[in-house]
Amino acid sequence: MTPVTAYTVVFLASASTLVLEIVAGRILAPFIGVSLYTWTSIIGVVLSGISAGNYLGGVLADRGGSRRVLGLILVGGGLTSFAILPLATPGLTTLVPATYPGVLRIVLLTALLFLAPSLLLGMVSPLVVKLTLADLGRTGRVVGRIYAWSTLGSIVGTFLTGFLLISAFGTRRIVFGVGLLLVGLGVAAGARPLRRQGRLSSRKPEIAEGLLLLLVLLQIHLRDGLQSGCYRETDYYCVKVHAERLSDGRLIRALELDHLIHGYNSLEDPTYLHYGYLRTAAALVDRLGTRTPRLHALFLGGGAYTFPRYLEAVYPDAVIEVSEIDPAVTRTNFEMMGLDRHTRIVTYNADARQVIERMLTGRTYDLVFGDAFNDLQVPYHLTTAEFAREIRNL
């Protein structure tokens, strides 16, 4: 194997591994949420797969690893990447008993999706080293360069996915693209080298088999495997909106971010409050409103904008500001959740702490309503004593 081929293979294989690792959080979010436990499980499972793959790849290399073996491993990595898509459905959570401890369930569900491709792609570098080494006197330089290109691929895959690919294509198309890339790379890497006399004929069987495999996979996955089930997939959430009819005939809509419903709204009646805690808050604000000529309220987290809409309807003179980190959530509220496009509510699409520290210095509020959630918990940086002091100074 030539150095250029070796560097290309390890670069793309490692980039694919990190692409899958980054999208894992978004793939799993609708089923188990995104928390410290989720990301700990993802990182641990992927690293375990890479470690086991490095070991097994070394064993295969010593037993006579060939280009065909390398090609099969890459194709296997592509196929197990494709397998993520049909598995990542609401039925995924039924594969691990609900009686298992929560953290163990998260680890096992993560492993079901991402351990196999991580393991197979971890086998690539040791095999490439074996296929590239021709002179033991250059072992250090060859191994060093191969692992440098491998690490560079991981870096590029990380930044490219987090900053560009998810926003541009969505997670399922990314996983599908990784699968196609790996299958194509496996076919190319496993094919016999061109002969000077035979030209392309020596590769025709492998190329034909690879193209047929790609066509079959395209047919299977383009039918329904690329459908995420999200109304909108953002950099932060899988956003879903669904309608429900109450026993009194009232039609309401629910805004679901990942696997947590953030609010129910009536499109016709902005004063409708579905949750008891919001009705309690409304009663407290009513007492506050009688003592305040013009209510000035700040909401940390917009969600379904349920309570901001309520205040806008009940207190026409109120000044209402919302810090909502995800602009796509705000757009969804305009489109689907009844937020008036001519609303007086002022929205800052930024992190709540940054909004307070950088944009609201010197302002005062009658009410600060904390409604920011990341999965089932309040983001840590919004729970610190320092942040509480900043709130008190508003």
Kindly label every feature range from the protein language model.
Residues 330-331:
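Short alpha-helix immediately C-terminal to the canonical SAM-binding loop
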Residues 322:
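Short beta-strand "acidic-cap" motif of Rossmann-like dinucleotide-binding folds
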Residues 255:
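Periplasmic c-type cytochrome electron-transfer domains
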Residues 1-232, 243-251, 259-264, 275, ...:
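Alpha-helical transmembrane segments of multi-pass membrane proteins
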Residues 235-241:
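A short loop-to-beta-strand scaffold at the N-terminal edge of the catalytic core in hydrolase folds
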